[in-house]
Amino acid sequence: MLTEKTKKELIRLSKVNNYIIKVETNQNFKHQSKCGDQILFQIIETNNGKFNLKHHASGCIVLLASANALNKLCNNKAKSEILNLVQKVINSNFANLDEIDVSLKIFNVFTNTNRKDCFLLPYKSLKDSLESYKPLRRTIR
């Protein structure tokens, strides 16, 4: 059972961010789970080789909170750094999630439950999105 503190933190992390996503169609990457949760990533590479990430997600509170935490954690970082972090989480190469980042500590509850898929969908989606990313003809400063 989740504590009230955990519930409040999940609700805070899951606040809906509205983004208007307007880029070339090959820069939008949508993933959907069996239960109907969906996430769409927009990836833009800046001139310094770092990536600006935006996402639009619809689904359960665990997915929304996980997506927001991941976006804050990976925004404005290099591709290799993002892929390394995401791969660690997907492969469970940690004793506790707070080893990776303190902001992920709240998700330790879900790593061995049936909600693990909800937690991992943004990570798998971002990994697939970055691996299939094709740079635009121009980059943004």
Curated annotation (Swiss-Prot):
A biological process term (GO) from this entry: iron-sulfur cluster assembly
Gene3D superfamilies noted in UniProt: 3.90.1010.10
Database matches in InterPro entries: NIF_FeS_clus_asmbl_NifU_N (IPR002871)
Single GO molecular function: iron ion binding
Name by which UniProt lists this protein: Uncharacterized protein BB_0085
